[in-house]
Amino acid sequence: LSYCWDDLDMAYMLEALLAAKGVELIWDKRCLKLDDSISQFMSLGCDCSEVILLVSNSYLKSQSCMKEVLEVLNGSEPLQRIRPLILPSAQIFSPEGRAGYVQYWAGEYEHLQKEIRKIGRGAAAGSLNQDLVLLNQIYENADHFLSMLADRYSPTELLEFVEHFCAGRQQQGCISRPSYPLTAPGGISLRS
């Protein structure tokens, strides 16, 4: 599951609905432990047969989420593996909406480039330059990614998405019971 932390409640609901259908999600809240590398975990999306993208406005403006998208896009057969759930806040279905995200990433790139110039390229030779390269990659791929999402049929309602997702997995023989305890924020059990 690729999602923005701003959408954590929706991610827990998605997990609970999928678990009830026998689908176990691999996501940071269940798999990462203290001091684990988030970047290494994010790169796992390249190896998964399916990646659910919980796409919201926050997701599309998150450098971490878009880095994860690039990892998936650079993996094998990304169109066959991406399963987007487009939330209402994501403005991807109009050219103006998509253009707004491309402009956003152009602005993020320009802003960091100016900040690096202020401190000097030598002082920013490490991670800041890597971030600048990443922002440029996000900017260069944003239109392609957003157009791909807008062109695909993907339910925008959570329950409908779960039904379609599980129907596809059942046809492939991929349904199993989650092996970990399911709890929502506050320790509420999601399993009866």
What are these regions (language model features)?
Residues 1, 52-54:
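Hydrophobic beta-strand scaffold positions of dinucleotide-using enzymes
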Residues 3-20, 87-192:
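C-terminal interaction surface of TIR/SEFIR-family domains
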Residues 5, 56-57:
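Short glycine-/small-residue-rich Rossmann-like dinucleotide-binding loops
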Residues 13-43, 58-64, 121:
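Conserved BB-loop
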Residues 31, 57-58, 84-94:
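Short beta-alpha junction loops
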Residues 48-49:
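An anion/phosphate-binding loop that grips the pyrophosphate of nucleotide cofactors and donors
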Residues 52, 81-85:
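Hydrophobic/aromatic beta-strand patches that form the interior of the parallel beta-sheet core
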Residues 57-77:
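Conserved TIR/SEFIR loop-to-helix hotspot centered on a Trp-containing motif
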